[in-house]
From Swiss-Prot:
Its main location: cytoplasm. Residues 193-195 are annotated as: G5. The lineage of its organism: Archaea, Thermoproteota, Thermoprotei, Sulfolobales, Sulfolobaceae. GO terms for cellular component: cytoplasm. It catalyses: GTP + H2O = GDP + phosphate + H(+). It holds the Pfam family GTP-eEF1A_C. GO terms for molecular function: GTP binding; GTPase activity; translation elongation factor activity. It comes from the Archaea. This is Elongation factor 1-alpha. It comes from Sulfolobus acidocaldarius (strain ATCC 33909 / DSM 639 / JCM 8929 / NBRC 15157 / NCIMB 11770). The gene is tuf. Residues 90-93 are annotated as: G3. Its EC number is 3.6.5.3. GTP binds at residues 13-20, 90-94, 152-155.
Amino acid sequence: MSQKPHLNLIVIGHVDHGKSTLIGRLLMDRGFIDEKTVKEAEEAAKKLGKDSEKYAFLMDRLKEERERGVTINLSFMRFETRKYFFTVIDAPGHRDFVKNMITGASQADAAILVVSAKKGEYEAGMSAEGQTREHIILSKTMGINQVIVAINKMDLADTPYDEKRFKEIVDTVSKFMKSFGFDMNKVKFVPVVAPDGDNVTHKSTKMPWYNGPTLEELLDQLEIPPKPVDKPLRIPIQEVYSISGVGVVPVGRIESGVLKVGDKIVFMPVGKIGEVRSIETHHTKIDKAEPGDNIGFNVRGVEKKDVKRGDVAGSVQNPPTVADEFTAQVIVIWHPTAVGVGYTPVLHVHTASIACRVSEITSRIDPKTGKEAEKNPQFIKAGDSAIVKFKPIKELVAEKFREFPALGRFAMRDMGKTVGVGVIIDVKPRKVEVK
C-alpha cells in the first residue's frame, strides 16, 4: 500500500464518450498497466481495425476478469500520481453502475466527468435522456463536489482541436452544474484526446490555446476531505462472526467517529449494549479505529443472535436513529409504469436492505430548477425527482444525509433493477429501549 494520501475516484459520463479509453490511457502513462497487457489489447484492437480503441480494450479485459472473479493485476484500478494514491471505485459501463454509485461501499471523494466534443455525441449526453446530465445530478445528490470535466475527442470536433467548441461545452456544462448547486471553484475543465494522450499526462502540442494543467496535474490539485472523527460513532455492520475462544466479532467500516478498546457501544435497532474488547484491521490488532477503517471488533455482553448485517453500532450517548418514518428526495431512474402511494420497493441503505412503503408523495421537483413543480402528485415516473415519505416494513437504522452521508443515501430496487435513488432529508425516530 502506498504511503501517499488516498482518494477514491469515480469516472462518469455518457456511454461512448471515451471513459474507458481515458482511464486506460492514464493508467498506462502512469505505468500501472504492464506492457504485456497493453500489447494484447493493441492486437485485439488491430484485428477489429479499431486502433484507437486499445485502451478501452484494456478496461474491458479488466472488467471481464473482474466479473469472472479473476483478479488480474488489480493495480489496474489503482494508480498513483506525484501526490496521491487513487482507487477507481467503479469503472464505467458496469451494469449496476448507478446502484453502486449510491450504495458504494466507499464514498467517492472526486469524479472525472468525461464529455465528448464530437458533434451529436455531446448533444446526446446533455439531452433529457442523456447520462451526462444524469451523472451530474447523481454526483451532486451523492455529495461529490470535486469534479474534473475532461472534454474528450477534441480531434473529432467539427473543426479538430477547436477552442471555440471547447469553450461552448465549458459554458453549457458550467451553467447546468451551477443550476444544481455545484461550487464552480471546485470544478475544472481540460480538453483531451484520450487515445493520443493529449493533456492526459503530457501537454498537447495540438491545442496551443490551452495553457492550463493536464488531467494528471488536476488530479494532484484535488483536496482530501476531512475525516468525520468529531461526529458520533456509526459503524454499519457487514457481517457477524462467532469465533471460538474469542466470542462475537462484528465486521464493518467506520463511517464517522472513533472506536477505542474499552468503549461501550450500542447496536441498533436491537438496542443491545456491549463493551469493545479488541479491534482488528487487516489482521492487525489496533487500539483505536477511525472513519474509513474496515474493522472486526470483539464485543463483550452481546451474543451472535443479537446482531446482524444491516444493524449499526454507535455511541451509547448518541445512538444510531431507528426510523419510524423518513422523508427523502428521490430520483426515479426506471419503472415500467409509475410509483404511487403504497408502492413497496426494497431500499438498500448502508448495509441494510429492507422493504419500505411509500406513505406519501409530498411534491414533484423540477430537475432543472430544483424547485417544486407539483404538490402531492398522485404518482411519479421514470425521470422524475420528488419528495417522498417512506415507512420501513421492518426496523431500520437511517440518518439524515447531511449529518451521516453513508447512512442517509439509498437505492430503491424492484424486479431485479434499480428503480431509483434517494437521499434522506428528515427522519421521524422510533423510540427503542436500550438494554
